[in-house]
Amino acid sequence: MKFKQDFFTQLPEFYAQVYPQGISNPHWLAWSEDAAKLIDLQQPTDVLLKGLSGNAAVEGASYYAQVYSGHQFGGYTPRLGDGRSIILGEALGPQGAWDVALKGGGPTPYSRHGDGRAVMRSAVREFLVSEALHHLGVPTTRALAVIGSDMPVWRESQETAAITVRLARSHIRFGHFEFFCHSERGQADKLTQLLNFTLKQHYPHLSCDLAGYKAWFLQVVQDTAKLIAHWQAIGFAHGVMNTDNMSILGDSFDFGPFAFLDTFQEYFICNHSDPEGRYAFGQQPGIGLWNLQRLAQALTPVIPSDDLIAALNQYQHALVQHYLMLMRAKLGLAERADSTAEQDQQDLELIGRFTVLMEKNQLDYSNTWRRFGQLDPSSAHSSLRDDFIDLNEFDVWYQAYQVRLGKVTDVEAWQQARNSVNPKYILRNYLAQEAIIAVEEGNLAPLERLHQVLRQPFAEQVEHEDLAKRPPDWGQGLIMSCSS
């Protein structure tokens, strides 16, 4: 790997230098060929294994943990920071630079009495979801590899330590700006320094002045709205949408007790530590705006409040428009050129009525959408009908759908288009759990198979049909904990 060290050299007050502590008996558990290409790597090697496991120095790396704060479950925590993630620097690749971080690399000054380690199950889950979201077309950080060990760590019970090698276009979070506004009062110069660095690194077309700052914040609002529209369309619940888990680039970031929907539930809670459902699936759009408001609050020393509010007011429109684009594609509805607000509302109601039907009939979210690839939209009889219990209610919806759909002249092409946007394979929690159990038993084959299938989520892959099925009873609606 070839590194540059812009964050390390230009923002010395934004991190603490800390070196990883190696794990014992390191070994590869998973490797992403796709992610490796981003930083010009080929195959995993012994030299790379030693370096990324913290057992040897990586040439050109500057090891550091970033400091930030954040709102966690609605309350402000004044000092967080990378408690178990150590960044090596920005690795250069054919299409730009990517931060390389060792998640689980050992304790840092921000560990808050933690051991700085990640357990194997959480490392595997982060690897799989990073791959899954990327291949579904959802903006996300990437995972290069998972490195296992025989090092014991204790959570609810004894587990083994592992490291996820994460790649990110940036590790700058909403919480970085909050820290230098709230926790380090009177440090407007640091906010400006961080803003200028962010613009030069990631928005070089914007000027480092008030006009550039305003344009940047509007872009963050729009990118966040688009990200959450993706989550709602694909059926993904993040689970811990704290402001310190929000990327300023609009990438999915910092995965914990996430879940893809099995049976559709509008307010599905995937996090055992969220009994009130603050971060439930259906709450994500509102939380996205709430988090942006906290970011805006942190930026008031450098951007006038009226300009911040004007940008925040664009959030709902950006969210709805991107969500409509994604959902119209799933349903096969033509995009309306210069659609009116009334037409958009009609489409939202049509989509909403269908998801309500899904929930009432306890249908699998992804599998139901996939069935549109078998639908003959020109037929008055829908092959979907047999999936529903309330047939009259479905018939009323389907008639309205056909009216909105209009005439389809090439049914086969229409069906293929549906299969290109409605995935057959998603990362169901029970599949991840089965792969983790197999890894614990020394069998990597299920993990490797699941990983390869998730790289082509829209392909039929008939030899892997079992991975597209609804979960067994024990795997329905699995709720994970924040313990990792």
Swiss-Prot record:
Signal peptide: none
Family as reported in the entry's similarity comment: Belongs to the SELO family.
Active site per database record: D244
Enzyme category, top tier: transferase
Name of the protein described by the UniProt record: Protein nucleotidyltransferase YdiU
Enzymatic reactions: L-seryl-[protein] + ATP = 3-O-(5'-adenylyl)-L-seryl-[protein] + diphosphate; L-threonyl-[protein] + ATP = 3-O-(5'-adenylyl)-L-threonyl-[protein] + diphosphate; L-tyrosyl-[protein] + ATP = O-(5'-adenylyl)-L-tyrosyl-[protein] + diphosphate; L-histidyl-[protein] + UTP = N(tele)-(5'-uridylyl)-L-histidyl-[protein] + diphosphate
Superkingdom as given in the UniProt entry: Bacteria
HAMAP family: YdiU_SelO
Statement: the UniProt record of this protein carries the keyword Cell membrane: no
Gene from which the chain derives: ydiU
Main function: Nucleotidyltransferase involved in the post-translational modification of proteins. It can catalyze the addition of adenosine monophosphate (AMP) or uridine monophosphate (UMP) to a protein, resulting in modifications known as AMPylation and UMPylation.
Residues that bind Mg(2+): N245, D254
Cofactor: Mg(2+); Mn(2+)
Cited InterPro entries: SelO
Gene Ontology MF terms in the entry: AMPylase activity; ATP binding; magnesium ion binding
Key words, A-Z: ATP-binding, Magnesium, Manganese, Metal-binding, Nucleotide-binding, Nucleotidyltransferase, Transferase
Organism the protein comes from: Shewanella sp. (strain ANA-3)
Entry's EC annotation: 2.7.7.-, 2.7.7.108
Binding site for ATP: G81, G83, R84, K103, D115, G116, R166, R173, D254
Pfam families reported in the protein's UniProt record: SelO (PF02696)
